[in-house]
Amino acid sequence: LPAFTKELTHITDDMLSFSPPASSVLPAFIEFIGSAILIAHNAPFDLLFINKELERSGMPTMSNKAIDTLNLSRWAYPSAKHHSLQYLANAMGIDAENAHRASDDAKTCRKIFLRCLKDTESVQKK
């Protein structure tokens, strides 16, 4: 892993050495998500990364639609100082203790998505 990624995520090369190769988990992942609309923070980045791994594994790329909570938060909270997942979680009082861990980030993203919907509900009704 690049030093920047290690610093940002606190994920080490040792941690990765115990992980199965992407090619062995991607089929189950693709089956799980099916044609669902995905919700992710900075969704284009995640989809690009996943599609590169799919290509590398000789699998078809995904074409799922996605809702990007980064863009959604920029629209819902234009005056927010930052729009990172961690910053938004802190500003909203959402516990995001284990940042940069897939399961925890997914739960945080879900909470931010629902909060954005709730906070913009009155705007949508106008």
Task: Show which residues each predicted segment covers.
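Acidic two-metal-ion nuclease catalytic site recognized across multiple nuclease folds
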Residues: 91, 110-126
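A short, structured active-site edge motif that brings together acidic residues
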Residues: 63-73
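Conserved non-catalytic scaffold segment of RNase H-like nuclease domains
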Residues: 1-64, 78-100
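Buried hydrophobic packing segments
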Residues: 50, 72, 109-113
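Ser/Thr-centric signal marking residues that sit
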Residues: 5, 9, 69, 108
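Conserved catalytic/binding loops enriched for acidic/polar residues
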Residues: 105
